[in-house]
Amino acid sequence: DKSVVKNIHLDKLNKWNYNKKKGIITHQSKKFFIVEGKRVSKSNREISSWDQPFLTQVGYKGGIIGLVRCKINYIPHYLIDAKYEPGNYNEIQLSPSLQGTYSNLDRVHHGERNKVLNKFFKKNFKTIKKLWVTEDGGRLFKKRNLHWIIEYNGKPELPSKRYKWLTLWEIDQLIKHGPIVGPHLRAVSYTHLTLPTICSV
């Protein structure tokens, strides 16, 4: 599918509002994130003080970066999403099975329900790893995500044509080919999918 991304004035953003009194940009739902300015002072940085805009997550839930694992012919495979984001270097990047803030997952945008979300809240799925990790603090203010890996023992079905089951070796080989693998999949792969993890159970 063809995508079109064009620059528009901030005043023209649909459903986003500039609060002149507070000097921030917010979504009309009061969810997602806030664009706000910060003045920083730190003596041991390149400069001792600076101003910059930040994206600040609304609420403290953060987001979920989730991977579904399933053994195919006794070999662990991971459900990977070929996901489009407008700011991606090459538009489509390989991403975890589930990726989004709680505002996205709660469908504040009134869009489609995530096809994988329910798997993470069913009792017949085993949690392999669950850990809160931080985001890039240079641009995102105190943002965190829940890295969540689950084991699925059923038939390895695909939620849609966007998804594919890959082994850790295949993911590692794709990482070596540049920006095709997105940062969240890189992070969860290198942080949690060590040899003892993928061979367990």
Please give the residue ranges for each predicted region:
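Compact, glycine/acidic-enriched structural inserts
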Residues: 89-125
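Conserved small/polar residues in nucleotide/adenosyl-binding loops
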Residues: 191-197
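An N-terminus-focused feature that recognizes amino-terminal "leader" regions
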Residues: 1-54
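Extended, acidic-biased charged interface segments
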Residues: 115-165
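Core of folded catalytic or high-affinity ligand/protein-binding domains
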Residues: 43-90, 96-99
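NUDIX/MutT-family hydrolases
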Residues: 162-180
